[in-house]
């Protein structure tokens, strides 16, 4: 398979739903700090925006470094660049709905900073190489060569509580559009719930 990170081969293996995200809805985001690409420490449980969108991804490509062996054959491994770019491309629409976007991986800070600058990401990536955040939520991982990576998952939290989980995420380049659609539906449901009884008949 080609290793152009912006392209998804048509024969990528589809990840299965092994139930590794079933325990998350209703859980609080853990109050742990992780290093962000702007050099700050971020505590996702303290985010003040109405919604927090956290896409958890295995790892993005590093210039001049080959991906782990058989990376494309691991279900759900390939596609982190298209996924990240999909969130970049609808970032304004997500922000308009009150969502703050973050990406999280086990990659080191320097690799995330390089990737963020190269792809012009308008949101922060969070580095969790010791899996402190991941262990607090019991996020699923897999191993490739000597790398421990998170399985791809997207978490939508409202006021610090996980409201929705997308797992497995496939295809990854459609993730942001699916999140956007879910948030639009949530906004419509909120508007309907706040409408006075009989208001639709006026």
PLM region spans:
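Chalcogenol-based redox active-site neighborhoods
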Residues: 1-202
């Amino acid at each position: 398979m080609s290793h152009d990170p912006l392209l998804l081969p048509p024969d990528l293996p589809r990840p299965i739903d092994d139930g590794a995200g079933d325990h998350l809805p209703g859980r609080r985001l853990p109050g742990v700090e992780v290093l962000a690409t702007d050099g700050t420490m971020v505590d996702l449980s303290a985010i003040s925006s109405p919604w927090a969108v956290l896409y958890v991804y295995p790892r993005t490509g590093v210039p001049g470094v080959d991906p782990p062996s058989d990376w494309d054959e691991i279900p759900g491994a390939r596609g982190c660049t298209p996924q990240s770019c999909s969130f970049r491309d609808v970032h304004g629409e997500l922000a308009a709905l009150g969502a703050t976007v973050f990406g999280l991986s086990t990659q080191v800070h320097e690799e995330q900073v390089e990737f963020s600058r190269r792809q012009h990401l308008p949101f922060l990536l969070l580095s969790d190489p010791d899996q402190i955040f991941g262990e607090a939520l019991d996020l699923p991982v897999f191993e490739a060569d000597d790398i421990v990576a998170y399985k791809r998952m997207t978490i939508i939290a409202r006021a610090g509580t996980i409201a929705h989980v997308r797992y497995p995420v496939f295809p990854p380049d459609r993730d942001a559009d699916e999140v956007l659609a879910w948030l639009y539906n949530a906004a419509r449901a909120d508007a309907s719930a706040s409408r006075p009884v009989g208001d639709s008949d006026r």
